[in-house]
Amino acid sequence: FIILVGPSGCGKSTTLRMIAGLEDISKGELYIGDTLANDVAPKDRDIAMVFQNYALYPHMTVYDNMAFGLKLRKFSKEEIKRRVEEAARILGIEQYLDRKPKALSGGQRQRVALGRAIVRNPKVFLLDEPLSNLDAKLRAQMRTEISKIYQRLGTTFIYVTHDQTEAMTMGTRIVVMKDGFIQQVDTPQHLYDMPCNMFVAGFIGSPQMNFINAVLSKNGGKYTLDFDKYHVPVPESKVNADLDNYVGKEVVLGIRPEHVHDEPEEIAKAECLLKANVDVTELMGAEIYLYVNINGTPITARVEPASTAKPGDDIEIAFDLSKLHIFDKDTEKTITN
């Protein structure tokens, strides 16, 4: 289950359209299975595509919408009936087969669009932001539905989205794109834990990673990241041969909000405490987002709901040093393990 993710205009939908044969491939080779597909007509590529808009025929029933492609390919009535009913059962829309699209909700229409693709039994499913027209609750439900379909069918899915939640929860591998270039291809967890550059680090994760300009210092064989009046130790697990090239230079310290703590037990054992002023708090139910600043440097922390911090409070925070990242300030590439 491949996810193409990135901001608007990064080239993810264009890539999908090239796979589908709707755009010319300017360079490189496209293989579908073992077949070189650059010059294969779209109708012969054995792919099925689901778009952001459902593209259902309003005058046809759900059954006829799902069966339409099979009828064009001259399948027998018995085979069409078998495939449509099986897809409807997988998607839980058996009771809607006699209805017209206007009698369905947005989520049901999206299921019909998926069903129309499933009956084709293609080698590859291409999905171009299929959930963006749905409300938040339906999106979450359909994410689960599509993941179940993938597990059941075992077919290749290539899914385009700008929503990193969809990317992280659905994909087995994620392709992060920016300005037409692939930034990183990885599993969701590895992408989250070990981003290759600041763009990936900031794009994956919500709230996004904190970035702090700092100077790398070395004293007695120990490295620290210095900013304001603070000297944040670099743990041994993050040290590599490249670090010496950056001593005395400006770098960027990266730390995710969930690795910034204000809990007393974390403060008590912290190697480095930082004093911060609370600007805003957001109660999310199971957690609180603290928006604080360290002498003007903004930091976001995702803390336990037991936190008593209020806007205007001066508090102490600590970083989970084992989770910090260091980036080259010029190239924005990661320089830590």
Where are these regions (language model features)?
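The feature captures the beta-strand-to-loop junction immediately N-terminal to the Walker
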Residues: V5-P7
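ABC ATPase nucleotide-binding domain helices that frame the ATP-binding cleft
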Residues: S13-L16, V112
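Helix-to-loop junction immediately C-terminal to a conserved catalytic motif
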Residues: A20
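A position-specific signal in ABC ATPase nucleotide-binding domains
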Residues: E23-D24, Y31, K71
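Conserved coupling/switch loops of ABC nucleotide-binding domains, chiefly the family-specific signature
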Residues: S26-E29, E79, D179, L324
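Conserved ABC transporter NBD signature motif
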Residues: G28-L36
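ABC ATPase nucleotide-binding domains
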Residues: V40-F199, F203
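Glycine/charge-rich catalytic "coupling/switch" loops of P-loop NTPases
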Residues: K222-V278, P298, T308-N337
